[in-house]
Amino acid sequence: MSESHVKISRTIIRGTSPSTVRLESRVRELEDLLDLERDARVRAERNANEMSIQLDTMAERLDELSGTSSQTHDAIRRKDMEISKLRKDLENANAAFETAEATLRRKHNTMISEISSEVENLQKQKGRAEKDKSQLMLEIDNVLGQLDGALKAKASAESKLEGLDSQLTRLKALTDDLQRQMADANSAKSRLAAENFELVRANQEYEAQVVTFSKTKAALESQLDDLKRAMDEDARNRLNLQTQLSSLQMDYDNLQARYEEEAEAAGNLRNQVAKFNADMAALKTRLERELMAKTEEFEELKRKLTVRITELEDMAEHERTRANNLEKTKVKLTLEIKDLQAENEALAAENGELTHRVKQAENLANELQRRIDEMTVEINTLNSANSALEADNMRLKGQVGDLTDRIANLDRENRQLGDQLKETKSALRDANRRLTDLEALRSQLEAERDNLASALHDAEEALKEMEAKYVASQNALNHLKSEMEQRLREKDEELENLRKSTTRTIEELTTTISEMEVRFKSDMSRLKKKYEATISELEVQLDVANKANANLNRENKTLAQRVQELQAALEDERRAREAAESNLQVSERKRIALASEVEEIRSQLELSDRARKNAESELNDANGRISELTLSVNTLTNDKRRLEGDIGVMQGDLDEAVNARKAAEDRADRLNAEVLRLADELRQEQENYXRAETLRKQLEIEIREITVKLEEAEAFATREGRRMVQKLQNRVRELEAELDGEIRRAKEAFANARKYERQFKELQTQSEDDKRMILELQDLLDKTQIKMKAYKRQLEEQEEVSQLTMSKYRKAQQQIEEAEHRADMAERTITIKRTIGGPGSRAVSVVREINSVSRGNRATSIM
């Protein structure tokens, strides 16, 4: 019993279908019926043996009483006829039992073969379910791997953000260097141009990094979309599990309803037993009344037994032997009663087993409900974690957007600075021509450049070390989020301070440059009067050309960004198309799997139809068996009637013996006791007949219950089959709708890809036109520069007068660059030379002002 419970619980845990459980219960019922038939056959054989013994005793008795009278001969003939009939009935019963046993064996073998085939099919379904489970586990592992990759990508993005912060600090340092070098801009044209070129290149690199960051951002968004799809698939799997659980709950409700029906049937049987006991009590009272009447008749006929009492003593001895035989039959019947009691106890034990199974099923249902609650809690936690990750992702996206805005602001400020530098260059171009002798500053600036390069290299090494430290501290990322936010706030404040400081420095530079321009204009106004109009016109043209060139560069950059965005969108569309194709393949595989499931369900329906037909055939066989049992019961009733006739004949003989012999009252009393014993035996025979009737009724009730259960099983199978077919049809419709949607999305993606390709081609043509315009403007710029060179040569020819003063200025500047601690001596020599040469006084004052400005800038840089 415990093993059977363990098997049942194991099958429920593994998710066996209710059809297998019903088939197993049906097999058990058939085995129980087979055991009952075997027991009935054993009892029938036992009864046949007892009847043969009784027939032998009766034959011996007939042989002994052969010479009594013609009545005895007639009785012997009747008994011989009855014996032959009984033998024929026994042979027929044996043949019927053998045929029934053979048919039952054949049916049992066919049922076992069908059940084995169904068990094999169920094992195949189990293997498929395990394969599906392994595939789901692999998919879950892949999703976890993708999640780890997304987290790593997130960590790398944050490390890149820190790298951008470090780059911003470097940009701050570079802007500080630019601020320090802006004081020397009037004397370092070539150096400033080279540094501007380097800054533009660094800016382009930063823009390329921003593009790479945008690509990584798009990749992260695609990974997030994949994760969302995986979560949707997990939700669908959970819905499937919930549907399976609901089906299991329905099966449990059906089993509970059947158990209640069986309990009601047991109550009905108890009511019938009570009614039968009441009928037996009424029959007992009626028989007792008849017995009292017969005893009164016996007392009336007792007087007539005095004559034949001597003749009937031998018959009384024979009756004693028969009474002994009847006592033996009584013992056997008591054994049968004990067997029936044992069967009743077995039925009670089976009822207890059924209640235990129901309790186990309830416990399993509670465990499944608990598991479902745990799964729902886990799903809620996963959803909350997913929402937190999405919030973090949105926050990071906002931070990246802020950084891109800040970088764009810095780019705009850099462009403004470049424009201002161009304006200062155009304003100071004439002065820079005259200050070409300041090449000695070049070596110092190169040394400073080397120092800056070494400092930049050191900063890059420090950046690498910081990146290594960040990789080492990736595991503590969750604890450092608050610190990162504080750092970002500090960076924002630093950027604001930097912007304010740059604006202040730019204003100071503009003021100093304006002052220097005023000074140089006051100094050079005498030399520029002739060519001022032409130079102003050329400067206006040059500014217009520079602005057009800058606008074209901006448009080129915007077009390049647009092209990159279109390429990224095209790549996204390609990825979406690939994802749609993969989803299409997955849906095709699901459709094939569902078609196979539909075929399996059809095969299961066919098997259930076969089982129904077999059950109907078994029902017909059981009906035939019941008819045979009714025939045997009828034969037993006929035998009972014959025995009652014999008892009546014997009572007549006893009456005659009482009339013949009145003196033997004590023997008559003994015969009366024997008659009472025979009456008790008759009562026992009647009870046996009533038991047989109750057994027949019970078999009829069981047959009705079996038919009802078969009808319920057929209705349940048809209902479940229709429900599964409808469910699968709905699933097929949903998959077809999803397939149509995916096809529509793929078509839209192809149309968008074609549209983007057309836009890309149009932008390419526009960029080519812009390049042609740029080349034309470049030609115009070259022509204007040639004109400017011609004007410059004319200015140089006019400025040959001031070469002596400029040579003195060069010597003084070289002395200042070689040794700054000799500045006082250089000033004294300049004053001496100023006293010697009058027209060079203004140049010396200009040099002194430049030196003072450079010293002030160096002091500020040191501070």
Curated annotation (Swiss-Prot):
Main location, first listed in the record: cytoplasm
Pfam families linked: Myosin_tail_1
Top-level division of the source organism's lineage: Eukaryota
Transmembrane segments: none
Coiled coil feature spans: 19-836
Known partners and oligomeric status: Homodimer.
Family: Belongs to the paramyosin family.
Physiological role: Paramyosin is a major structural component of many thick filaments isolated from invertebrate muscles.
The name this protein goes by in its record: Paramyosin
Gene that encodes it: PMY
